[in-house]
């Protein structure tokens, strides 16, 4: 259960909060503000009431953790800055709407009863483009959307709990190469982190479907060590895939997808697990008779696409709604969407594009103004997260 209110003063009451979402959308849903999608309501709002910091408060029960397990609290994004506290303990700052936060809360949760999670969200401030980036720079108003009260401040991405053992898998991803249509090379990368104060030995197991490609790789980690594991066909012969089901853009073939299930085991017990969905594809670029040409899997692509300004101007598009909206682009015979100024950050958007054969021209959070962000360090850190 979430609630949001101004950090100071009584300009607005406390209301149930929509998480993920922006502050202003919560006040619209609570009936404090008229729906800005009708009439001239967007221009009648007293914007000054939202030009301030807000505090989110969430309550949750302590889940069963188990012996030797670690309880994690994960934040996927807060706009623009956030300070996270659990039961009075500060967990850390978040800076930029793409920066994720992973917090070990095993010893901070209440043994019984409810836990109090507080997030102080700092208002974005002026001027927005490009000084306040990384943020939704169109929130200050554009030719296609009005000013968004509060500049889309809020807990704008998912917040959730997870469990792991002493060793966890961090940010696994897959890279593929397609030398020809009958052969592909799959490269798997993941960080493994030993959170204990003792060295450990374990096994990284994986299975890729379809195809039933199974593998195992022994790993030894020193106490507190974090290391990147890279597996190619040299370590796992099955990662040289014969007759692969290739991912093709809309109109060129099926957008085939694979899943890779990774499990790290210590002493025969699962410590952590992750699942990655990916397409076997390889992009290429070339100049042909003075023309820049995009290729995929060795074939030239005639790009047909449109500009995706935002999912919804108050960030109210979630989950399966992305599938409907991306499917409309497929039905229009598009094969590319430009994620304009990086204004859509949800994983559901990228997953829907994968399923429907839509390539993404993915911008960062800068427009054509020559000015740079005030905090280049935060911009660069968020670029790595993206």
Region locations from a protein language model:
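Secreted/periplasmic carbohydrate-active enzymes, especially glycoside hydrolases
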Residues: 1-340, 344, 352-356, 385
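Acidic-and-aromatic substrate-binding clefts and catalytic sites of carbohydrate-active enzymes
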Residues: 337-347, 369-372, 376-378
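Hydrophobic residues in well-ordered beta-strands that form the structural core
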Residues: 360-362
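Active-site loop/turn elements of alpha/beta-hydrolase fold enzymes
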Residues: 364-366
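An active-site-proximal structural segment forming one wall of the substrate-binding cleft
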Residues: 379-386
